[in-house]
Amino acid sequence: MKAIKFKSITKKRISDTMTPVGLYLKFRDKYANTLLLESSDYHSKEESFSFLCIEPVVDIKAEQHQLSLSYKGSVLESQPLENNNFYELFDQYTGAIDLDCDPSIKGFNGLYGYTTYDGVQYFENIELKAKAAPSAIPLLQYSFFRFVIAINHFN
């Protein structure tokens, strides 16, 4: 699979006049699939970040027992999830992202997303036979975003 290359540019700003939710409300109407991940650990001042992820570029989704890799909305590859091949396919798809960035921010550049409760069937020897809801979402979706705003709540 051909690598998809990215170069990260960072800027630091003081964020004491805005909240993650306030920023999210501003961006969600302009950019589809904006994601807010808030820190819920207020006891420790270490690594207490919230992330606002804007404009997904690369998507990895598990739907209808298929794992697909998309770039800017176009499916590049899709393979069936069978015989416990999830980890192999996921590693293959994540390996397609070639990132050039400063080592100090490498931990912030990556995939953000979710795994649903029913997604456990891809990690364990469990086969679920629940009926899909008409408004079902992918069982697993992780995206590499064009913009990631990391808000450090204590610095």
For each predicted feature, which ranges?
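Signature of the chorismate-utilizing enzyme
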Residues: M1-N155
